[in-house]
């Protein structure tokens, strides 16, 4: 009887550890293994828009969707994104879930600016989480070259295509957001065709 209880206890411990590991895989971004590539890359582009309060994630997701031909505003996307904190901030997992609901196999990754630029070759903008002053901020990265990244930033004046250019070094600094496990986070989404 004791051996059976010990055996059941071991199996429960194994199942608990597996559950924790699977949960961590859902919560934390995976390290991107793509090789960074030199060269100029631009993706499908759209019109940037000014955000409402805490709507940068919605604006970035809407930019990506508009670049792929969908008609949506940042406010509409923000309203649909799950996993909002009580203050209105969006978790990266919420944006990933929303893009999956829209038919995109979105993946949350951690990687360098070079790796992010390699992901742009898939054809759609990449949503990056960066430090903007004292707050965290989502932007759509729409292109890059050997020196700079081109952003569609909802805090900058609206424009066609991109409205902010940052050096690779500056972008790498902006990616250091101060949350262990979430440094250098971005969300990729290639259309599910």
What are these regions (language model features)?
Residues 95-139:
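...with weaker cross-activation on analogous glycine-rich loops/strands in unrelated enzymes
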């Amino acid at each position: 009887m004791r051996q059976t209880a010990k055996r059941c206890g071991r199996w429960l411990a194994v199942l608990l550890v597996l559950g924790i590991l699977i949960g961590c895989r859902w919560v934390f971004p995976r390290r991107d293994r793509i090789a960074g590539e030199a060269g100029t890359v631009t993706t499908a582009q759209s019109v940037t828009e000014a955000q409402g309060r805490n709507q940068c994630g919605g604006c970035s997701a809407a930019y990506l969707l508009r670049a792929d031909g969908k008609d949506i505003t940042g406010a509409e996307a923000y309203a649909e994104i799950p996993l909002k904190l009580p203050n209105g901030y969006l978790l990266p997992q919420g944006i990933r879930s929303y893009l999956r609901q829209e038919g995109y196999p979105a993946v949350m990754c951690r990687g360098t600016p070079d790796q992010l630029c390699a992901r742009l070759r898939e054809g759609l903008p990449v949503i990056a989480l960066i430090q903007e002053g004292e707050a965290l901020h989502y932007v759509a990265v729409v292109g890059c070259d050997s020196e700079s990244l081109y952003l569609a930033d909802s805090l900058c004046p609206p424009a066609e295509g991109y409205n902010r250019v940052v050096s690779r070094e500056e972008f790498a600094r902006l990616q250091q957001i101060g949350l262990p496990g979430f440094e250098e986070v971005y969300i990729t989404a290639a259309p599910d065709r």
